[in-house]
Amino acid sequence: GFIRIENATVQIANRIFETRLYNYFLTLPEVQNGEMYKLALRGRNQFIREGKLDMRLLLEKFTVHFDDIYGDRDEKFVEEDGRRYFMLYLKPIINGTGNYYVEARTRNQERTDLIIDYLGTQYIVEMKVWHGKAYNERGEEQLKDYLEYYHLKEGYMLSFNFNKKKEIGVKEIKIGDKTLIEAVV
């Protein structure tokens, strides 16, 4: 079947169905007529440099556009909402050339939030709703572990922070031999 009941909630039963549903919902006219999608579509060529996805620039632009459009929101926001906004922005940029995997499972049964595959290069993105510095540091450590698992040197973290005095932007963090590019919106 398409769905299963787990812990009293309905879940998509299969990763293929889940990806197809994400793709379907991201292609609906009302979604593609939204401001985030249009901004990404207009500027999509700037994110490809020498056949590679410029993830740092993508996060920088996403941060600016998200803050301009949704920055005043303080309503209930969950990690899944952030993933949808980011995927909506990402879709026209990688469309036809790249792909993404949502909550890809590692052999030790951990789940990465998003893996982008663009022309054979993988980019791991961890997304979090801000719940304080300690929680954020655990997310950074989790991303470092994913990078270790996938034998990558650089990973990306996107934090959705709804504090009034947050510092919006993109910064680089070194953890051992890994580089984390972290965006805060």
Task: Give short role names for the model-derived ranges.
Residues 86, 114-116, 120-131, 146:
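Conserved catalytic cores of phosphodiester-cleaving nucleases, focusing on short active-site segments
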Residues 136-140, 147-176:
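Nucleic-acid nuclease catalytic cores
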Residues 129-135, 156, 182:
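Conserved RecA-like P-loop NTPase helicase motor core
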